[in-house]
Amino acid sequence: MKLTLLAAAAVLLAGPAMAQAPLPDVPILAGATSTPDCGNLAGLAGKAFCVSAPLAAIGALADAYVAELEGRGWLPAGGDTNRVVFVKRREGGGCDGLQMQAFYDTSRPAGPDATGYLGFGTIPGDLCAAGEPGEAAATPQP
């Protein structure tokens, strides 16, 4: 599952540019400002929906987004210090994927008033379709 989540994250970052628009399950919460260019950082402009807030508040804002997404049926399924990958079961089977990435401009001082960003993007495909790394498909026995 970890390999699937990492691959899904790479697809989000390397995917084709799409129009910048809010995602259906990702509202602009209090304290967040829509940032269409994603700060021109991390190659996310046009590939992700981004919001910004002062860096001192970005952790609390990320927590608020996790709670909001959980309330909409998204389950945290993995990630690391600055990234959360969510999955949501589809009615007909399979899972949709969504990623939230926190970042800031590391070429500038990281003071509390610096701008921090949260980037959101869907992960294409069915995240529940892939098995664990190294897992072989079951072969029917005669």
Model-predicted segments: where are they?
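N-terminal signal peptide c-region/cleavage motif recognized by signal peptidases
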Residues: A9, A14-P16
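An acidic-aromatic pocket/loop used at catalytic or ligand-binding sites
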Residues: A19-P142
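Sec-dependent signal peptide recognition
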Residues: M1-A8
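Homeobox/homeodomain signature
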Residues: L3, P16-M18
